[in-house]
């Protein structure tokens, strides 16, 4: 989990006075892990410039988050107990997410301390390519797919006068960039085994130090 790294990054920015803000993304399942609670407590205590964004997609791998969590909002309800002022937002509403994120980042940058945003959304596919997702009701999947934020926001933009051809071109460029990155990764050399133990320490080494 990146919680500790996020707090470390935020502390570094606070110490150096750079005005930088760390943004840490997590899933709903991570809210049941001890490191999540430790990170929120430390961030609030030290008033770190960090924004935690929980993508609550309703499932903790293969388990509905509601069946293993005692509170209805697994991230926001916990964050409040650590002194944060959490925000719950429709994670499929592009502009709503943008607005709450901008506000949280602005507060953190201006000394307002950490923030947590719980974005309610849905995982369209399984947890991995090996997961067909049969444990989810078909009606539930169809309901959420109908709220897919990409076509929904495309409709918003075209309704405001954006040329559909421009949106097609943007989508094509994004797909091309992903395809290019995939091919470059496949064509690249395999990492050398000895690199697995480098950069353990800040100086790039890995030898044990007494």
Segments predicted by a language model, with ranges:
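C-terminal intrinsically disordered, low-complexity extensions immediately downstream
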Residues: 180, 187-210
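Glycine-rich ThDP/TPP pyrophosphate-binding loop and its adjacent helix/strand module
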Residues: 3-187
């Amino acid at each position: 989990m990146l919680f500790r790294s996020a707090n470390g990054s935020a502390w570094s920015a606070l110490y150096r006075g750079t005005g930088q803000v760390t943004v840490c993304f997590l899933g709903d399942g991570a809210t049941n892990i001890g490191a999540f609670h430790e990170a929120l407590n430390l961030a609030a205590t030290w008033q770190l410039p960090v924004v935690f964004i929980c993508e609550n997609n309703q499932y903790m791998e293969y388990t509905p988050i509601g069946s293993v969590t005692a509170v209805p909002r697994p991230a926001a309800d916990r964050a409040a107990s650590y002194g944060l002022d959490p925000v719950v937002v429709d994670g499929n509403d592009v502009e709503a997410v943008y607005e709450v994120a901008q506000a949280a980042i602005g507060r953190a940058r201006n000394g307002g301390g950490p923030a947590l945003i719980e974005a309610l959304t849905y995982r369209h596919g399984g947890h991995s390519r090996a997961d067909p997702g049969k444990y989810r009701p078909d009606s539930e999947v169809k309901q959420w797919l109908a709220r897919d934020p990409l076509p929904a926001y495309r409709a918003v933009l075209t309704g405001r006068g954006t040329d559909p051809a421009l949106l097609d071109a943007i989508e094509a460029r994004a797909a091309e960039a992903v395809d290019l990155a995939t091919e470059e990764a496949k064509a690249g050399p395999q990492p050398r085994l000895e690199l697995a133990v480098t950069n353990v320490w800040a100086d790039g080494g890995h030898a044990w130090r007494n």
